[in-house]
Amino acid sequence: MEVSTRAKERFCKDCNIPIRLFQEPYFMERLKLYDRFYGTIRKWNLFLEELNKYHCEQDYFEEYNRVKDAATMGIKESKSYQRFNKEDMNYFAVSHKNLPGKDIFKASFDRKTFISIDMKKANFTALHHYATDMFQSPKGIADTWEDFIGGFTENRHIIESKYIRQVILGNCNPKRHITYERYLMDGVLTKLLDKCFSIERVVFFSNDEIVLEVSDLEVGAQKEMLKRVANCVKKMEFSLRTEYFLLHKIGGMDGYYKEIYMEDGQTEIEFKCLDNYMLPFVMRAFLEEEVTEGDRTFYHEGLLARFVEIPRVVVDEKK
């Protein structure tokens, strides 16, 4: 079946893919260009495979809404959720106050090295930690978000969708989630300060992430600290992820990218603070490819438009 603009837009929202140009041939060109960094082709093929199981797109959207509504109702009708809504949230106050709360994406942190600890799927993880039976689907109490949504549908694209999780849990008193998430991360910080690092290293603290700057340490010492942090994180009662990365400022614009060092010695690139207009030009610079007419095309006030000039993009030499 031919895929509509509405369905393409939903696909990009579901997968958190920064594409806002849905006309062909530009949409497919963007999917191919972004594949190395976002895994877009696999996700698109899965979306098409699932979409083709329906008689028409409207049937798919109705299934999507049915899953969303059923999952939301299941959470809200649970006794655990109702108890959570009656909690005195002052009980979940944090002990570490006045920590830096502005993100690290600023020029003064260019070429600085960091270790981050973040809560995976924070809204789900926090509520699941509070009470596992809040996430009971027709198939029983779920251990993961995917298991929970999988209790309402067999559509793998919907099961993997980040957007539907945000919509569902965004309808379940999110301010309380954030308070509880922050309380949990405060507890994580307490345990890490006891064994891994001093509080002066913390350059960012939020409800779902802690970031440490380690640029002043030799590489060996950085890796030793990473190992200590990772070992502590594994012992926590809920799912956390550690990242070890070098932050780069992209010359010619306000964007950044994280060069993430993986355990196998490889690196991954994650772009930050880039809008959907500039991202194609940055991708071409990373891939060392020529900018195409499609890269210069964008959608503006109901019309296709094109950049007259090509932005200057300067990236550090990549390993």
Where are these regions (language model features)?
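Generic structural signal of hydrophobic/aromatic residues within well-ordered alpha-helices
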Residues: A7-F11, F27-R30, Y34-F37, W44-F47, ...
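Common nucleic-acid-contacting/processivity interface regions adjacent to the catalytic cores
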Residues: E2-S108, V167-R182, E213, E317-K318
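A generic structural motif
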Residues: S206-S215
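Hydrophobic face of amphipathic alpha-helices
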Residues: K68-A71, V188-L189, V229
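Helical catalytic core of nucleic-acid polymerases
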Residues: R66, E77-E200, F205-N207
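C-terminal polymerase-core module
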Residues: N171-K175, L217-K319
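Short, structured coil/loop segments at alpha-helix boundaries
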Residues: S4, K8-R30, T40, A131-P138, ...
